[in-house]
Structures are given as C-alpha cells and as structure tokens.
Amino acid sequence: MIKNKILTATLAVGLIAPLANPFIEISKAENKIEDIGQGAEIIKRTQDITSKRLAITQNIQFDFVKDKKYNKDALVVKMQGFISSRTTYSDLKKYPYIKRMIWPFQYNISLKTKDSNVDLINYLPKNKIDSADVSQKLGYNIGGNFQSAPSIGGSGSFNYSKTISYNQKNYVTEVESQNSKGVKWGVKANSFVTPNGQVSAYDQYLFAQDPTGPAARDYFVPDNQLPPLIQSGFNPSFITTLSHERGKGDKSEFEITYGRNMDATYAYVTRHRLAVDRKHDAFKNRNVTVKYEVNWKTHEVKIKSITPK
C-alpha cells in the first residue's frame, strides 16, 4: 500500500546570508511520506536551487528510508535539474576575423561526503553507457536490500523503487571516479553524424563550415546539425544510495556538483581555404557546488552553501 501524506511540519531551508543574492534562486517542494509496507516508510524531501550566473539548476530529491529491519539509516539521493549548454559564437576581440564557437564537450555530475559514518552503497548509472536514451531502476526490499535493474522495465519486485531516465544523444556517460565517499560522472561528447558521415568528437573540423555570411554564427553548422546537449543543455538524472551508522551523529553534509567542460573551435578564412583550430577543455570545470546538510533524526534538509556564489 502506498500513501502520500503531506507533512504538516515546514522544512527549514536554511537560507543563510551568503545565499541571499540576485544570482541564486531557492525553492522546495511539498514533503511526503510513502508507506512501503511492514512498518517501513520513505520520507521524501526535495530541494531546488538555481545559479543564474552559471545557468545551472539542481533539483535534488532526498528519500530517507525508515526501516526497523535495517540496522542503518539509508538515504536515496536523486539528482535532477538542468545544465545549460552555454554554447556561444563570437569574434575574437583582438582578431575579429577569427570566429569562435564555445560548446560543452563534457557535463559534470558528482556527489561526495567527508563523513566517516556515511558510505556510498549504490549508484546509477554504472559503467559506461553510450546509448542515446538511458533508463535504469534502483529498488529496495525490506531489510536493507538495495538492487539495481538494467532498465525501467527490468525484472524484480521491490517495496520501493526509484528510476532514472535521460537523453544523451551523441554523448556517452562514464563513471570517472568512485569510492565509499562519493561518485563522479562525466557525460562526454562521443561522435556526431554530419553530411560527410560519422565524425569523432575530437575531430579538429567538427562543427566548422565554409562561412555563409560575415557573422561568427555563419562559420559553424546550423542548429539542425547540433544535438540538444549542444543547442540547449543537459537534463541529468542520477542516483546515489548512502548508508549511515545509526546513532553516530545526527547530521551529515553532502556536496553535489553540476557543471561543464567547454571546448573552443576557432575558424577563419585564409586566401585559399577555411582554417580551423581547436582547443580541448578550453574552459574546464565551470561548475556549481551546493553543500547540503541532512538530519538523520528529523529528516530535514538544509542548504549550507553554494560555490561560486
């Protein structure tokens, strides 16, 4: 039986002074409880925070697993939101005949903690995924049994489950690092279909074309040849599952980072041809890191800080 019951208590958002600025927006959703049977329940919290400066939104769902048959506290963190591509076209100031396209080669998503009483016990997605559409499920059975299924339609009956689903056309997801205190993913450009066939994301001439006009935009392929992750941005959907030693500290802090690494492609016309230069990771780690505090007893979530402000 599942019931969605709105909590009467108001969640403290923790709007400390450094967050009160015009470049940051914070909101929260209603808090809910889901009964998953045998006296166990999921206490759900949601936090939204937007950095207007970097055009990044974190929508984070915190699902506390309250299960007397499991000897630890558990928390499922689903990381959603939006990371704008910030693709731009411009003339170089000192050399206006050189046109530049800045575009996201990689999107960054990570979670980490320094709490010695907290361990990362599961995460999605795992391994390397190169399919355009990604969909996976995390399931929980009473007693502390977390499992992952290969897809939303995967087999298995769970007391509680959480799914991820996102599109990464022309990109590939890789786990860059993982240990008991965190995990870091990179969603990286892979290959692109062009009028001249399949082209590697590392190709020097990628996206450049013979100019159709004098503007910087005219030196690069039109929007209908660019995937959504370059035209607009990326909607992440990632999950981490964390355990906490019961009775060892009421609060823990987690840092969640979203961002992008930007490549720069330069194009200009010489006497005889179009010349193209490429700088990989020209603007790296254009990230936003939000520090969250969770209370294992009251199941409250607070935003402690955001970097950069």
Curated annotation (Swiss-Prot):
Toxin that seems to act by forming pores in the membrane of the cell. Has a hemolytic and a leucotoxic activity. The keyword Secreted applies. Residues 1-29 form the signal peptide. Keywords: Cytolysis, Hemolysis, Secreted, Signal, Toxin, Virulence. This is Gamma-hemolysin component A. SUPFAM superfamilies: Leukocidin-like. One of its GO terms (biological process) is cytolysis in another organism. Belongs to the aerolysin family. InterPro entries: Bi-component_toxin_staph (IPR003963), Leukocidin/Hemolysin_toxin (IPR016183), Leukocidin/porin_MspA_sf (IPR036435). GO terms for molecular function: toxin activity. It is found in: Secreted. GO terms for cellular component: extracellular region. It comes from the Bacteria. Toxicity requires sequential binding and synergistic association of a class S and a class F component which form heterooligomeric complexes. HlgA (class S) associates with HlgB (class F) thus forming an AB toxin in strains producing both gamma-hemolysins and leukocidins. HlgA and LukF-PV can also form a complex. Its main location: secreted.
